[in-house]
């Protein structure tokens, strides 16, 4: 799918009636470049626009640099990247000007980033986990693609896919999107969950007979540091952009305790060592304080959830430069679903 086709699809899906309060249009492009509005060299270049350029006219623009939204701005795009951002000037428009998409009744802003997604499932799947055994490979791939498309259409141009029971489907979807054969955001994926048998990342639920558990979901299961190192390397060679360890129990897994550690510090260190050898980062699913501390000391780059961490562990993370991706909205969903 070409950039103009993507733009038209987005414009159609986001076409909202003009309101007194500007409706929100998210400028969602598969390749967004950074722009410094004070850079005059780009302004000069814009005077020599090419026929392949695309221009968007935005009623309001939130560019991430100015303290206030900018009024009536034009964004010039070339080869999928932002070339210039400047005030709209009617007198400069001519028959030779590149085509302009009029979004003067909308607000534009750069694409958003979601740091914690799982495209290979839906929220309602937690009501009956047997759906994971009943979906075919094609159905799972389509689910990933559908969720990716929905995510892009709501304004998120980059996502961090933090583990999957069906990592191969995510790899396939990422490839299709990169080849412009499907509509979706950039996907950085951790591949399979690296987890202990029966742990928070193991697809073991009463609804699924053991002999029907999809083998794809078992790619990251290990019991010792050496096994975790093997699984980590296999995930990277299969296409993982980074790695995800399930250091503690998980809220929606059966038979696990979110407040209890599952992987040992040695297990996590083994994964981190492999990741560093390949120039990859590691994130850790942690709820328990002990798991958070173990993961930090083992050398992970970030923590997911971090629900039960003590202040001292948070201070340790700050000292070690460990980032947090806490997805705090999950609390409301958990209270509702149980």
Describe these PLM feature segments.
Residues 106-175, 179, 197, 266, ...:
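Metal-associated gating/positioning segment near the N- to mid-region
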Residues 1-17:
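N-terminal secretory signal peptides that target proteins for export/translocation
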Residues 129-142, 212-229:
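Active-site mouth loops of central-metabolism enzymes
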Residues 141-148, 224-234, 287-288:
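Short, acidic/polar
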Residues 144-170, 183-193, 240-253, 281, ...:
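Divalent metal-dependent hydrolysis catalytic cores, especially in the metallo-beta-lactamase
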Residues 30-33:
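C-terminal motif of bacterial Sec signal peptides marking the signal peptidase cleavage site
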Residues 37-52, 61, 65-109:
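Histidine-rich, glycine-flanked metal-binding segment
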Residues 197-198, 246-338:
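Active-site core of metal-dependent hydrolases
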């Amino acid at each position: 799918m070409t950039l103009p086709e993507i733009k038209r699809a987005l414009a159609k899906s986001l076409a909202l009636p003009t309101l007194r309060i500007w409706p929100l249009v998210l400028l969602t492009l598969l390749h967004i470049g950074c722009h410094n509005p004070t850079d005059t060299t780009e302004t000069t270049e814009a005077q020599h626009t090419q026929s392949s350029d695309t221009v968007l006219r935005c009623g309001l623009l939130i560019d991430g640099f100015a303290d206030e939204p900018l009024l009536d701005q034009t964004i010039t795009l070339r080869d999928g990247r932002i070339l210039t951002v400047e005030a709209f000037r009617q007198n400069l428009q001519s028959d030779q000007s590149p085509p302009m998409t009029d979004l003067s009744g909308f607000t534009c802003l750069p694409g958003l980033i979601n740091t914690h997604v799982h495209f290979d499932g839906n929220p309602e799947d937690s009501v009956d986990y047997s759906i994971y055994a009943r979906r075919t490979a094609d159905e799972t791939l389509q689910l990933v693609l559908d969720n990716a498309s929905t995510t892009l259409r709501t304004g998120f141009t980059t996502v961090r896919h933090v583990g999957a029971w069906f990592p191969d489907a995510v790899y396939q979807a990422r490839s299709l999107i990169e080849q412009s054969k499907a509509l979706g955001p950039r996907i950085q994926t951790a591949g399979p969950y690296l987890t202990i048998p029966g742990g928070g990342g193991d697809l073991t639920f009463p609804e699924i007979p053991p002999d029907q558990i999809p083998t794809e979901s078992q790619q990251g299961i290990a019991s010792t540091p050496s096994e975790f190192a093997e699984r980590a390397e296999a995930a990277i060679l299969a296409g993982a952009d980074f790695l995800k360890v399930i250091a503690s129990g998980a809220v929606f897994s059966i038979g696990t305790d979110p407040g209890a550690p599952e992987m040992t510090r040695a297990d996590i260190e083994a994964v981190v060592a492999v990741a560093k050898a390949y120039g990859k980062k590691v994130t850790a699913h942690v709820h328990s304080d002990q798991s958070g501390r173990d993961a930090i000391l083992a050398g992970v780059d970030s923590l997911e959830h971090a629900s039960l961490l003590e202040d001292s562990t948070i201070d340790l993370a700050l000292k070690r430069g460990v980032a947090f991706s806490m997805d705090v909205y999950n609390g409301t969903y958990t209270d509702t679903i149980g």
